[in-house]
């Protein structure tokens, strides 16, 4: 009986032990026995800034947001935009892109190395594309992407990153609104053309060619 009364008096202390300081907390933790160390909560990476990339047609190079200069195999300038083909990434993936100032997207087809397969056919990055010289272009990527499975679906990605960048002051409200409106227009256009990127762009008098 005495033992039961003692344990009943200790139970609240045992429960509260992690938050109790001084001798009471010390003895409560001793009674409970050793506890596993607290698990560190992973911290989210800081919000990023819009990624700016430059394309030098004369030099056959591109310069990414970190300042790395990479070779480009081929450029082609058309009235509706700029085409480029290049090798990117550690897996030596081959990539073809069209930078399209109107409707404000970068359309990418990636040719993966053997053993790697993507679940989508196109990625449409929502971007600001500007021609800043006779042979020089700039694309500003504000995080939103649309992954397209031809004839099946279009999925918006990156909204959380854009909102985090806006909250951190890296992107003003007008720019964030413009990116979301542009993404909505892309999704609506694709839905109206059976999720076919080529058909949607042809309806806008944009004819893409690929390797």
Positions of PLM-derived features:
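Structured beta-strand/loop patches that form or line metal/cofactor-binding pockets in enzymes
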Residues: 87-144
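Cysteine/selenocysteine-centered motifs that mediate thiol-based redox chemistry or coordinate metal-sulfur cofactors
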Residues: 182-211
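A hydrophobic, small-residue-rich beta->alpha segment in the mid-to-C-terminal subdomain
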Residues: 142-186
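Hydrophobic residues embedded in beta-strands of well-ordered beta-sheets
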Residues: 81-83, 105-106, 154
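Well-ordered beta-strand positions
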Residues: 75-77, 99, 147-148
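Short, well-ordered loop/turn elements at secondary-structure boundaries
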Residues: 78-79, 117-118, 149-150
């Amino acid at each position: 009986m005495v033992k039961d009364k003692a344990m009943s008096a200790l139970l609240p202390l045992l429960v509260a032990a992690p938050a109790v300081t001084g001798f009471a907390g010390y003895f409560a933790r001793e009674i409970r026995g050793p506890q596993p160390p607290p698990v560190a909560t992973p911290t989210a990476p800081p919000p990023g800034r819009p990624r700016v990339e430059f394309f030098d047609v004369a030099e056959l190079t591109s310069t990414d947001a970190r300042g790395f200069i990479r070779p480009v195999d081929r450029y082609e300038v058309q009235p509706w935009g700029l085409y480029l083909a290049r090798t990117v990434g550690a897996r030596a993936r081959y990539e073809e892109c069209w930078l399209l100032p109107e409707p404000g997207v970068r359309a990418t087809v990636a040719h993966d190395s053997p053993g790697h397969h993507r679940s989508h056919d196109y990625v449409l990055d929502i971007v600001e594309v500007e021609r800043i010289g006779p042979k020089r272009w700039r694309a500003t990527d504000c995080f939103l992407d649309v992954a397209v499975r031809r004839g099946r679906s279009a999925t918006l990605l990156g909204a959380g990153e854009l909102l985090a960048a806006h909250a951190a002051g890296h992107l003003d409200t007008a720019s964030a609104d413009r990116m979301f409106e542009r993404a909505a227009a892309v999704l609506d256009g694709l839905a109206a053309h059976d999720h076919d990127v080529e058909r949607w762009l042809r309806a806008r008098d944009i004819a893409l060619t690929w390797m």
